[in-house]
């Protein structure tokens, strides 16, 4: 490892956004590097994961209840991290150890070891533990296989098809013998989905005739729809769902910055009638709370698929902790291409 710097930076939540987050919602603070006490380790963040769920953690406590409490004003922004042990007063950790944790948006963290996962002595791609081999990959795996239950010959439609979850869902779908239709934003992403990820078709949701294109791409209807987006994408999908279709609901990123209900007529009666008449299974899930007990199964199978080249993975590395706020703002607008990871420090 390189010599540790003499400063400790951390991004805290300065204010709660109304609509889209702005740079003013975050504040960068500096202090001395902390010293571990008895039973503690000092972790230096190397990679920080940025994910859409972070927008929900910026909400007010008085907002609609969610599965995790909001970040307090003045507290460090949350986030999964890959770190290295700098110094240790803990019997299970030695300087130089690689660990997966939840240190958040900061250079250093003191930890008692609770919740840390060792990544081995010399992991080949340590940041992948935040992506295809971590929470996004696990989310794709369990959501599709346990809730979606794809069968060979079925049509699988995937929203946000080039994001870390959607890209993995589509590739697992191909492994299971599905016809896969991706939905993404822009020609470049759609081309990548087909040429690299192996989707049979990928449609640009920004097209004026997107709904018509989707209907043409799914002449036999939709058997499984993996929901990451919501909004007008779901509106186009709903009438195409087949009887006994399955809809794993992973995210609704199109509405994360919304300040109220969408314009237009109330869509709930149509949704409920469609679910009833077509016996559709639509289920939300929280990966850690619902499937944490199956992490070993996922790690074994996904590791094998990645090693065999059956699952391809794209990472968007951004250098510098100072870039985190703008990177998250861009992520929520769909400006990312692949899994967004902040490289906080050198990984040597």
Question: Positions of the model-derived regions?
Answer:
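C-terminal hydrophobic helical "lid"/dimerization subdomain
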Residues: 2-6, 289-348
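A short N-terminal beta-strand-loop micro-motif at the entrance of redox/enzyme domains
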Residues: 3, 15-46
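Glycine-rich beta-strand-centered segment in the early N-terminal region that forms part
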Residues: 32-50, 58-105
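NAD(P)H dinucleotide-binding glycine-rich loop of Rossmann-like/cofactor-binding domains
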Residues: 75-87, 91-160, 202
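Short, glycine/polar-rich helix-capping loops at beta-to-alpha or helix-loop-helix junctions
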Residues: 107, 185-193, 210, 267-272
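Short amphipathic alpha-helix with an adjacent loop that forms part of the alpha/beta core around
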Residues: 209-219
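Glycine-rich phosphate-binding loop and adjacent beta-alpha segment
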Residues: 232-311, 344-348
């Amino acid at each position: 490892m390189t010599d540790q710097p003499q400063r400790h930076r951390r991004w805290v939540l300065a204010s709660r956004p109304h609509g889209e987050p702005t740079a003013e919602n975050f504040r960068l603070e500096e202090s001395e590097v902390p010293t571990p006490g008895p039973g503690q380790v000092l972790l230096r963040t190397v990679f920080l994961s940025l994910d859409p769920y972070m927008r929900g953690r910026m909400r007010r406590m008085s907002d609609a209840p969610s599965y995790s409490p909001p970040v307090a004003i003045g507290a460090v922004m949350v986030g999964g991290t890959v770190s290295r042990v700098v110094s240790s007063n803990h019997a299970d950790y030695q300087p130089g150890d690689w660990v997966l944790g939840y240190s958040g948006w900061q250079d250093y963290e003191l930890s008692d070891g609770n919740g840390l996962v060792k990544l081995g002595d010399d992991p080949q791609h340590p940041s992948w533990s935040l992506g295809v081999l971590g929470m996004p990959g696990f989310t794709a795996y369990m959501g599709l296989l346990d809730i979606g239950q794809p069968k060979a010959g079925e049509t699988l439609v995937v929203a946000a098809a080039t994001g870390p979850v959607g890209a993995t869902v589509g590739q697992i779908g191909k492994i299971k013998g599905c016809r896969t239709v991706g939905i993404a934003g822009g020609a470049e992403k759609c081309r990548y989905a087909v040429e690299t990820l192996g989707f049979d078709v990928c449609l640009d949701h920004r097209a004026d005739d997107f709904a018509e294109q989707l209907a043409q791409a799914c002449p036999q209807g939709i058997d499984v729809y993996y929901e990451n987006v919501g909004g007008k994408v779901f509106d186009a999908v709903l009438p195409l769902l087949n009887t006994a279709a399955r809809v794993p609901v992973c995210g609704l990123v199109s509405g994360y910055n919304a300040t109220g209900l969408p314009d237009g007529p109330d869509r709930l009666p149509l949704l409920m009638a469609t679910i009833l008449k077509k016996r559709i299974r639509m289920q939300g899930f929280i990966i850690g709370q619902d499937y944490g007990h199956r992490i070993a199964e996922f790690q074994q199978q996904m590791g094998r698929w990645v090693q065999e080249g059956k699952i391809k993975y794209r990472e968007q590395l951004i250098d510098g902790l100072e870039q985190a706020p703008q990177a998250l703002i861009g992520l929520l607008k769909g400006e990312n291409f692949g899994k967004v990871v902040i490289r906080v420090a050198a990984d040597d």
